[in-house]
Curated annotation (Swiss-Prot):
This is Leucyl/phenylalanyl-tRNA--protein transferase. NCBIfam families: aat. Belongs to the L/F-transferase family. Its main location: cytoplasm. It is found in: Cytoplasm. HAMAP family: Leu_Phe_trans. Keywords: Acyltransferase, Cytoplasm, Transferase. It comes from Paracoccus denitrificans (strain Pd 1222). One of its GO terms (cellular component) is cytoplasm. InterPro entries: Acyl_CoA_acyltransferase, Leu/Phe-tRNA_Trfase, Leu/Phe-tRNA_Trfase_C, Leu/Phe-tRNA_Trfase_N. It catalyses: N-terminal L-lysyl-[protein] + L-leucyl-tRNA(Leu) = N-terminal L-leucyl-L-lysyl-[protein] + tRNA(Leu) + H(+); N-terminal L-arginyl-[protein] + L-leucyl-tRNA(Leu) = N-terminal L-leucyl-L-arginyl-[protein] + tRNA(Leu) + H(+); L-phenylalanyl-tRNA(Phe) + an N-terminal L-alpha-aminoacyl-[protein] = an N-terminal L-phenylalanyl-L-alpha-aminoacyl-[protein] + tRNA(Phe).
Length: 212
């Protein structure tokens, strides 16, 4: 499955809880997945360690939204093994133009050092992938994204598969049926990913302190 997949069909599939992946960057075929255990992160409540708070307090990084979607997707695909193939790259660009795909960039000065991207439907954010060119950049992206999703009214943060890195930030796995219930509820919520600007790092730290 790949040739007949459109951005509209892809959104309809996500609304049912399934998502596509390729076996490799060079593979033409896409396959549908619906894990028995689905990874999620707490909107507005990711765990931020003391060491990460200290790191952010003394760094000069900043975060932006939808500033370089193509660059973030390229960064996520730039690894030895990736499930992002050419058909998916084209679909993500279509979804970005439609307003259903978004990126968060982490920058040191003007350099893109990390980020993540995902899809939105109602109050659900489907995180697709993230990358890091410096230590802690992917953690910073998760922290900023957590704050942003909460500010914009999202209630579900889907990470597809659980993993130890996400678990260290508060991620957990839930059964498929529970995920479907949460997804159905989130789809009824009119969240807007572009409703708020991102805070600077000092405002982000203050927000973390108030909610922890």
């Amino acid at each position: 499955m790949s040739g007949g997949l459109t951005a509209e069909r892809m959104l309809a599939a996500y609304a049912q809880g399934v998502f596509p992946m390729a076996e490799s960057a060079s593979a033409a075929q896409l396959y549908w997945f619906e894990p028995a255990l689905r990874g999620i992160l707490p909107v507005g409540g990711v765990h931020v360690s003391r060491s990460m708070r200290r790191f952010l307090r003394h760094c000069d990084w900043r975060a932006t939204i939808d500033n370089d979607f193509a660059g973030v997707v390229a960064g996520c695909a730039d690894r030895e093994e990736t499930w992002i193939n050419a058909p998916l790259l084209a679909l993500y660009q279509d979804l970005f133009r439609m307003g259903h795909a978004h990126s968060l960039e982490i920058r040191a000065g003007e350099d893109l050092i990390g980020g993540m991207f995902g899809l939105t439907l109602g109050g659900a954010f489907f995180a697709e992938s993230m990358f890091s060119r410096r230590s802690n950049a992917s953690k910073a992206a998760l922290i900023w994204m957590s704050s942003h999703l909460a500010r914009c009214g999202f209630t579900l943060w889907d990470t597809q598969y659980p993993n130890p890195h996400l678990a260290s930030m508060g991620g957990r796995a839930i059964p498929r049926l529970e995920y479907r219930r949460r997804l159905a509820a989130a789809l009824r919520i009119p969240a807007d990913f572009t409703a708020h600007a991102l805070p600077d790092v000092q405002a982000l730290l203050q927000e973390i302190t108030q909610t922890s």
